[in-house]
Structures are given as C-alpha cells and as structure tokens.
C-alpha cells in the first residue's frame, strides 16, 4: 500500500504520514520498502493503520511529534509489540557500530573544522590589530603633518610681517633721508645766498671806499678841506647802507660777523686816511695810490670761500 492510499485509510494527509514515517525511522524502526516508478517507497501494511491512528491522536493532544512519541514509548512499548514483532526489522549491532563510527568521524570532522575556525579567528584578530596599528600610525602622521603645516604657515606669516615692517622702516628712512637732503640743500642755498650777499657787500664796500679815497685825493688837490669833508660824508652814507644791507641779510640767514667787521674797519681806515689827506696832500696822494693799487689787487684776486659740505658729504664723512 502506497502513501496516498494509506493516507486515505488512516484519514491523514500525505504530509502527516511522511512526518510520522520520518520520526519512526529516526528512532531506529524500519518499515517495509518497495519500488515505485524507479524510486524507493514505503510499503504500508494493514497492521500499520492502527499504529498511525494512535500516533496521530497523540500528536493532536500534545501538538508535537517528539512529545507524542515520548509519551507513547513511556506508556507501553507498543512499537516493538505491534510493528516490530519481526527481529529482522530491529537495529542490529552492526548497524550500531556503523552509527558510532559515523558519529566519531563527524565529531572528528567537527573538531578539525573548529580548529580551522579558531585559526581563522586568530588570523582575523591579528589582522585587526595590524589594521589598528596602521590606523594609529596614519593618524599620528596626519597630526604631525598638520602641526608642520601650521608651523610653516606661522613662519610664513612671521616672515611676511617682518618684510612688511622692514619695508615700512626702509620707506620711512628713505623719506627722512630725502627730507634731510632737501633741508640741507635749502640750507646750503641759503648759506650760498648769504655768502654771496656778504661778498657783494664787501666788494661794494671796498670799491666804494677805494673810490671815495681816490675822489678824496683828487678833490683834496682841488678843493682841500671841503672835498675831504664831502668824502667823509659819502663814506658815512655808504657805511649806513652797508649796515642796512647787513641787517637785511641777518633776517634771511646767519650774518658773517667777520665780513661786517672788515667792512666797518675798511670804512674807518678810509675815514682816517681822508683825515690824514686833509693835512697833507702829498701823503694823501701817495696813500691814495697805494690804496687803489691794493684794492685792485684784492678785486683781481678774490678770497676763496670755504666750500660747504652737503648732506651726503657729511653723511659719508667726505
């Protein structure tokens, strides 16, 4: 009897019948087998109908195949009495030995697999440690690179600030030098103007004094005391003019005291010479000739003036 027909007889589904057969075979009980369409199939007997009905009822009560079989075995060994009356269907010692050997092989295989799994876990753990070390090294390198970049940026900023301050100081020093140069040039031009004014004043004073001396000598010959008096008055007028010119030059720059003193001394000498010429015509004529000769030599050979040093000459001590 095949599974489909047997399921109809016991009023169970084919799936339930196959499940019961599976649990029976797992517990070492073997049912009759036959060949159907080239495949092995269970050959159910009439006596199997009652057994399957009891098992189905017990499964409904316990809602579990395992619990149902356990309770049935505790109640009575009905499986061996009803189904397994034939010793041929009972498991033999040879089958038990084979099962033990199979179990031993499975256990050995499991141990080997467990050992391999342990090695793999160790390798994975080691690789994780190496990865952590690499990550730490990368992190430290990144930190060091960041610090070096910050240091470089700080040094660049410091260099830029130093360059800016240096350029500012250089510009200020250049401006100061230019201002000082302009000031020195102005001072030199003023000094040259003052020196020129003093020189012209001295020349005018000498020329006028000499001309006064010459005129005095000539007029003394003609008019005697009257001409001498007029010459003295002219010399006094020239002296006042020279004094006014000296005062004007003092307002623009520092007056050369030596030049003014020389002018006054020359005027005084001219006045004294005019007085002497009034008393003695001969001596006045000789004196006038000598003075005219001296004045011509002085005018032909002007006194060299000391060259004033400019700003850059004084800067480099030239």
Swiss-Prot record:
Region (Disordered): 172-318
Superkingdom: Bacteria
Keyword Coiled coil: yes
Keywords per UniProt: Coiled coil
Compositionally skewed regions (Polar residues) per UniProt: 237-248
Coiled coil residues, start to end: 67-157
Biased composition (Basic and acidic residues): 175-193, 219-236, 249-274, 300-310
Coiled coil listed as a keyword: yes
Record's protein name: Uncharacterized protein SAV0385
Gene source species: Staphylococcus aureus (strain Mu50 / ATCC 700699)
Taxonomy of the source species: Bacteria, Bacillati, Bacillota, Bacilli, Bacillales
């Amino acid at each position: 009897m095949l599974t489909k027909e047997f399921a109809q007889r016991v009023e169970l589904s084919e799936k339930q019948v196959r499940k019961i057969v599976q649990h029976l075979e797992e517990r070492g009980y073997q049912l009759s087998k036959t060949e159907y369409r080239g495949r092995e199939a269970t050959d159910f007997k009439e006596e199997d109908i009652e057994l399957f009905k009891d098992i189905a009822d017990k499964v409904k009560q316990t809602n579990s195949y395992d619990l149902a079989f356990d309770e049935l075995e505790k109640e009575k060994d009905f499986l061996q009495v009803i189904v397994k009356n034939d010793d041929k269907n009972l498991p033999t010692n040879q089958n038990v030995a084979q099962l033990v050997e199979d179990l031993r092989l499975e256990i050995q295989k499991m141990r080997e697999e467990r050992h391999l799994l342990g090695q793999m876990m160790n390798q994975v753990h080691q690789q994780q440690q190496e990865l952590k070390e690499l990550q730490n090294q990368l992190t430290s390198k990144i930190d060091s690179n960041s610090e070096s970049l910050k240091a470089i940026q700080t040094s660049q900023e410091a260099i830029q600030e130093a360059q800016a301050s240096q350029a500012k100081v250089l510009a200020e020093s250049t401006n100061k030098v230019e201002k000082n140069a302009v000031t020195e040039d102005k001072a030199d031009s003023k000094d040259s103007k003052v020196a020129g004014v003093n020189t012209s004043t001295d020349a005018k004073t000498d020329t006028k004094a000499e001309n006064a001396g010459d005129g005095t000598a000539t007029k003394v010959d003609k008019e005697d005391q009257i001409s001498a008096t007029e010459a003295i008055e002219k010399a006094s007028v020239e002296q006042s003019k020279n004094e006014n010119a000296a005062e004007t030059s003092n307002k623009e720059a520092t007056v050369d005291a030596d030049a003014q003193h020389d002018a006054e001394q020359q005027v005084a000498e001219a006045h004294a010479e005019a007085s002497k010429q009034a008393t003695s015509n001969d001596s006045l004529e000789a004196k006038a000739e000598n003075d005219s000769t001296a004045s011509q030599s002085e005018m032909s050979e002007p006194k060299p003036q000391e060259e004033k040093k400019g700003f850059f000459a004084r800067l480099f001590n030239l």
